[in-house]
Amino acid sequence: MNQTRVLLIFSWLTVATLLWMDWGKNKNETLEISASQNLGVDSNLELEHAVPQINAGAVPVQKDSQLIAVAPKVPVINVKTDVLQLKLDGFSVLAADLLRFPQSKDRGAKPIKLLTDDPNYPYSATTGWVSQSNSPVPNLSTFLPEQPGVSYKLANDQDRLVVPFVWTAANGVSIRRTFTFERGRYAILIRDEIRNGGETPWNAYVFRKLSRVPIPNILNRAMTNPDSFSFNGAVWYSEKGGYERRAFKDYMNDGGLNREIGGGWIALLQHHFFTAWIPQKDQASLYLLAQNGSRDIAELRGPAFTVAPGQSTTTEARLWVGPKLVEQITKEHVKGLDRVVDYSRFQLMALIGQGLFWILSHLNSLLHNWGWAIVGLVVLLRIAMYPLSAAQYKSAAKMRKFQPRLQQLKERYGEDRQKFQQAMMELYKKEKINPMGGCFPILIQMPIFFALYWVLVESVELRQAPWLGWIQDLTTRDPYFILPLLNIVIMWATQKLTPTPAGMDPIAGKMMQVMPLIFGVMMAFVPSGLALYWVINGGLNLLIQWWMIRQHADFSRKRSRGNIK
């Protein structure tokens, strides 16, 4: 296999892979527990509280029309921290704006609305209680703020803000719910304290759910739609099953999800942002995916609680509402939560992506520019792979030198391709030319290239991050197509330096001639950060190849003059 053919194969593999990433379906091969099966607690979990002994379908999802009919107007509390602005009604987080993430770079642009009470595309996070043994529980309208009509704001001298709600039943049972916010943090601690002031035991289980109507533009995958590049759907994590996911478009495949999990979490992902329920490690829950009309729901049911008269108990969970910031996610110390930065569903590619981002983030801390960090990453990778690349360049230089002899062989054997191939291989063997010399370095770069693609697509840290001049957002495509045009020029120049094999098939030769144009068109639709990587990498490759060819030519001239033996 010659170098030109290797480049051709690599090019078509790249195009095919990107097309697969654009149109391919995300499949999960998971074994789900039947929705009709009664769930108990795994004895190996050794949990204090049990998962409710119920069928997954025993508590049907209420229709939106039913909720509107039974729920009177509920007082809504406004809360503002340094990073979030929210609306709470005690039962749900109805809306959440991300104050540090504007929708665009335009002056005065509004912040990203992650949770929203938009009637067309509602997206909320809810936690409540379901009765067992006819115990009274709060409904949508009965969690009341302790200080009605008060708006809460995290003051400049505050690091912590607590927003309390309370529910009290006629029989003396009460639940005090607190939402705790911390400065600079997107994880909200929601804590319920149940006090039984009645005369009979109180039995109920807690549920926590995320519910949204997906916006159409995240369901329609297209190379011109940045929001569809990333995975959009539900993900969950367990000790046994690891990281699993289900796209919105495939939400109820295999019957949804119905599984008992301890020590995990569940989330809804979209481009750059996510919401997640993170329960206590020592409590098991029933993990569910369900649909209610146009709503997709990710829910945790359980644990169940029995509170004796005169006693009290507490349960708490974290609700993440925010961006996929690697540093902040790491600080939560939740196993597997770093996978929401979804570089790949494949563990190896995800690890490569995490490593590339680690290097990029450190380069950015030194250079204070994500674009120059990408340039620095290219330089480091070229240095690391130079020993491998040197063989590729030397092979190309030798191939270029022996092109006239290969052409002579082709003319000598004419249409007898078998004899021509035999003579060509004998020449390669005699002159110690390795036609596979350019293959391995290119194969090494393929996983790096694809992992970097997902790093640039997924990393919210690069969102709206400029490089210089016309590149003002490295996660969107080049607005003036300058980088794709540069890529065409660089690939064309590289082809001119690379010898065309004498025995190359004419059709393959024509395909190689149009390959720079194909790659240029493809680069017009990828993030400009990836196009920058490819242009810098190709430019360095061109310079090194030119230098190696020149060095080899000088060496050959000196040897022919007798200066080198």
From Swiss-Prot:
Subcellular location: Cell inner membrane
InterPro entries: Membr_insert_YidC, Membr_insert_YidC_N, YidC/ALB3/OXA1/COX18, YidC/Oxa/ALB_C, YidC_ALB_C, YidC_periplasmic_sf
One Pfam family in the UniProt entry: 60KD_IMP
Keyword Protein transport part of the UniProt annotation: yes
NCBIfam families per the UniProt record, alphabetical: PRK01318.1-3, yidC_nterm, yidC_oxa1_cterm
Role noted for this protein: Required for the insertion and/or proper folding and/or complex formation of integral membrane proteins into the membrane. Involved in integration of membrane proteins that insert both dependently and independently of the Sec translocase complex, as well as at least some lipoproteins. Aids folding of multispanning membrane proteins.
Family statement drawn from the similarity comment of this UniProt entry: Belongs to the OXA1/ALB3/YidC family. Type 1 subfamily.
HAMAP family on file: YidC_type1
Name of the molecule in the record: Membrane protein insertase YidC
